[in-house]
């Protein structure tokens, strides 16, 4: 006997992927998330491919995962996908100490962040 299946929190035309423990500050990750918010999935992938930000590689992985979830788990058409939401959350902050002059030490903060990407299938517009 297993637990009853939980209701989906997303509508039927949406799929999501979450990347956790990304070793970057949430502010820097949000700069890259702003690039893809509201874009078509194919255009967002192209933007991330040529972005010079280090974290863009991990954001691209997460977006590809969301697209794969949409295609394989929810039977959505990949060509009609749009990045409806891309939001960033705070993770843990590792604290380290660095030696300074005169026998003192300084704190170094190493923040982590989380990224959630939700893709939505929109109806293809009929070209007239």
From Swiss-Prot:
GO terms for cellular component: cytosolic large ribosomal subunit. It comes from the Bacteria. Keywords: Ribonucleoprotein, Ribosomal protein, RNA-binding, rRNA-binding. InterPro entries: Ribosomal_uL22, Ribosomal_uL22_bac/chlpt-type, Ribosomal_uL22_bac/org-type, Ribosomal_uL22_sf. GO terms for molecular function: rRNA binding; structural constituent of ribosome. CDD domains: Ribosomal_L22. Pfam families: Ribosomal_L22. One of its GO terms (biological process) is translation. The keyword RNA-binding applies. NCBIfam families: rplV_bact (TIGR01044). PANTHER family: CHLOROPLAST 50S RIBOSOMAL PROTEIN L22-RELATED, LARGE RIBOSOMAL SUBUNIT PROTEIN UL22M. Belongs to the universal ribosomal protein uL22 family. Part of the 50S ribosomal subunit. This protein binds specifically to 23S rRNA; its binding is stimulated by other ribosomal proteins, e.g. L4, L17, and L20. It is important during the early stages of 50S assembly. It makes multiple contacts with different domains of the 23S rRNA in the assembled 50S subunit and ribosome. This is Large ribosomal subunit protein uL22. The lineage of its organism: Bacteria, Pseudomonadati, Pseudomonadota, Alphaproteobacteria, Hyphomicrobiales.
């Amino acid at each position: 006997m297993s637990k009853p299946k939980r209701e989906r929190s997303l509508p039927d035309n949406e799929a999501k992927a979450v990347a956790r423990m990304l070793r970057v500050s949430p502010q820097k990750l949000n700069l890259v998330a702003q690039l893809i918010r509201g874009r078509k999935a194919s255009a967002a992938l192209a933007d991330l491919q040529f972005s010079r930000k280090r974290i863009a590689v991990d954001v691209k992985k997460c977006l590809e995962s969301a697209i794969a979830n949409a295609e394989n788990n929810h039977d959505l058409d990949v060509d009609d996908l749009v990045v409806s939401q891309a939001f960033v959350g705070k993770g843990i902050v590792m604290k380290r100490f660095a030696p300074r002059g005169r026998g003192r030490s300084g704190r170094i903060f190493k923040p982590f962040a989380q990224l959630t990407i939700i893709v939505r299938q929109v109806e293809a517009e009929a070209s007239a």
